[in-house]
Amino acid sequence: DKNFDEESFLVGARVAFEVVLGAYVSGDREVLKNLLSQEVYDNFRSAIDDREKAGHSIEETLVSIQAAEVVEASMEGSRAIVTTKFLSEQVHVLRDGQGEVIDGNPNEIMDVVDFWTFARDVSSQDPNWQLVATRSLD
């Protein structure tokens, strides 16, 4: 897409990263439904449902986004697809129903590498991108 502005895309991608992470942690399915493809939404919703059924709570603190960069961009017909690599610092804690830590450490900041793929139909008047894939490096 000749109108693609990488700098403003990355500004929006950083905001989306924070909003999606926050909505996932709080279990806000409505926010997620508007930002994610159906497949990604179904995966996120399933993880939230499982967490809630188990009586677990998650605390995810995004300390900082150290870097965001476009690592791949392509066109499939009128669909622009952009994969972004995020380097962030996060604190991740999963607690059981009694508040006991069952995963993570509330006092440990972890370096996290995520690859998020966004897509949008460039022939559409809608300027918003949708998150269509996620993966993390562990």
Question: Which residues are covered by each model-predicted region?
Answer:
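Short flexible coil/turn linkers enriched for glycine and charged/polar residues
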Residues: 26, 38, 74-80, 112, ...
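Core segments of small alpha/beta cavity-forming domains
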Residues: 1-63
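Surface-exposed, charged secondary-structure patches
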Residues: 56-96
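Surface-exposed loop/turn and secondary-structure junction residues enriched for glycine/proline
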Residues: 7, 38-39, 65-68, 73, ...
